[in-house]
From Swiss-Prot:
This is Golgi to ER traffic protein 4 homolog A. The lineage of its organism: Eukaryota, Metazoa, Chordata, Craniata, Vertebrata. The keyword Cytoplasm applies. Residues 1-22, 306-325 are annotated as: Disordered. Component of the bag6/bat3 complex.
Length: 325
């Protein structure tokens, strides 16, 4: 009986709090609609810190989120970006569990920010760090997918590609690469767009996405004749490589790399990626010294990460940032 009464009182208190927040939101919205942007912005900040000090983290976060959307709708980029950062602050300090709804909200804020603003860079960095849940991995795959799609819509293919590589959306990545290659690439390099993506997915131990991106890209690209086999030797190599990875036979992998050296020499990074793939899927030992030092070595290390734990689910290992060359 007592427990039921306490629960009922708690529900009433929660309803009162929500009603109070809605009234405050109404007043703030009216200020923004009148064009009192500065005053409204300062009031949002004051309420945020008040709610946070009272441990009303959810109310604080929801108020900042709705406020940011409101400022974005009135083209007040600076105020909107500031409130977006406060949304992140509430998530960081409250140690909130990562949910798809929260990731969608963060992606929504990201999509509304000025693509060229430094605030957007800072926002996405913090959002990815929070979404990793303290695991040390570089962001939640779903958030990377949302970001990749937004950047693709903005025709920022370079950055979109980076985030697709850290997602599990091989099909989306392939469709983006088809558009990227068709609008920005040379016809003679249609095979290289997908080859690099497949090799990098494999270096991240994401066999599933590597296979999906290859199949989807080769089926949908208007300049690629239906295969296999393909007209382009590099595409045949990638096709055989994916089969070899599934089979796990070192001799097949070794012969394959030897036979296709002319195609692999088109990009100096291919053999570096294949060295790592040999370690991950065929039991080859790491090379004592890389044939590429300096910048290329650093690019490869950042792609592959330093993790050596092979008992990891597909696509979940080596989630450190990928430098795209």
């Amino acid at each position: 009986m007592a427990a039921a009464m306490a629960e009922q009182e708690g529900s009433k208190g929660s309803a009162r709090n929500r009603g109070g927040v809605q009234r405050v939101e109404g007043k703030l919205r009216a200020s923004v609609e009148k064009g009192d942007y500065y005053e409204a912005h300062q009031m949002y900040r004051t309420l945020f810190f008040r709610y946070m000090s009272q441990s009303k983290h959810i109310e604080a976060r929801e108020l900042m989120y709705s406020g940011a959307l409101l400022f974005f709708s009135h083209s007040q980029q600076n105020s909107a970006a500031d409130l977006s950062m406060l949304v992140l602050e509430s998530l960081e300090k409250h140690e909130v569990k990562v949910t798809e709804e929260l990731l969608e909200n963060l992606a929504k804020l990201f999509s509304l920010m000025d693509p060229n603003s430094p605030e957007r860079v800072a926002f996405v960095s913090r959002a990815l760090k929070w979404s990793s849940g303290g695991s040390g991995k570089f962001g939640h795959q779903k958030l990377h997918q949302f970001l990749a799609i937004t950047l693709w819509k903005e025709q920022n293919y370079y950055e979109s590609r980076y985030h697709f590589l850290h997602s599990s959306d091989g099909e989306g990545c392939a469709n983006m690469l088809v558009e990227y290659s068709s609008t920005r690439g040379y016809r003679s390099e249609v095979d290289m767009f997908v080859a690099q993506a497949v090799l990098q997915f494999l270096c991240l131990k994401n066999k599933t996405s590597a296979s999906v991106v290859f199949t989807t890209y080769t089926q949908k690209h208007p300049s690629i004749e239906r295969g296999p086999p393909f007209v382009q030797p590099l595409l045949n190599f990638i096709w055989f490589l994916l089969l070899a990875v599934e089979g796990g036979k070192l001799t097949v992998f070794t012969v394959l790399c030897e036979q296709y050296q002319p195609s692999l020499k088109r990009d100096p990074m291919y053999n570096e990626y294949l060295d790592r793939i040999g370690q991950l899927f065929f039991g080859l030992p790491p090379k004592q010294s890389s044939s590429y030092g300096g910048l290329l070595g650093n690019l490869l290390n950042s792609l592959m990460g330093s993790g050596e734990d092979d008992d990891v689910e597909d696509g979940q290992e080596d989630s450190s940032p990928i430098e795209l060359d």
